[in-house]
Regions:
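Charge-dense, helix-prone N-terminal extensions
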Residues: 1-117
């Protein structure tokens, strides 16, 4: 088994995924008016029917345990270029300026900052 395969298997571990999901849930639910619903099989958080965070656990076997969220206009390429191990362009919503954030690469404080900006 090559290193990339090992990395993907380790990252999609259910226990690790659940721990990250709890982190994200705690931050998202601290937002006034936040609601959690399942969307495409994953927890997604809304404020006034607007999505602001999507949880993604190994979406289409991509190896990421991440959140996808919108960023201020023009920030997506800057974040990805500056911190390529932390940020990536997610499928579907990346074209709209959203980023994926690798949850094992970001502190709770930094994650909360990005979620609050979303």
């Amino acid at each position: 088994m090559n290193e990339e395969t090992k990395r993907m298997l380790a990252k999609t571990n259910t226990q690790e995924s659940e721990e990250h999901k709890r982190r994200v849930r705690r931050i998202c639910m601290s937002m006034p008016g936040s609601e959690e619903k399942l969307s495409h099989g994953e927890p997604t958080w809304f404020v006034r029917k607007r999505v602001f965070v999507m949880f993604a656990n190994n979406h289409h076997n991509d190896g990421h345990i991440a959140v996808w969220l919108p960023t201020p206009q023009g920030m997506q390429p800057i974040l990805i270029a500056s911190f390529p191990k932390t940020f990536f362009r997610p499928p579907y919503v990346g074209i709209k300026g959203w980023v994926g954030i690798e949850l094992d690469q970001v502190s709770d404080d930094d994650l909360a900052l990005h979620i609050h900006e979303a």
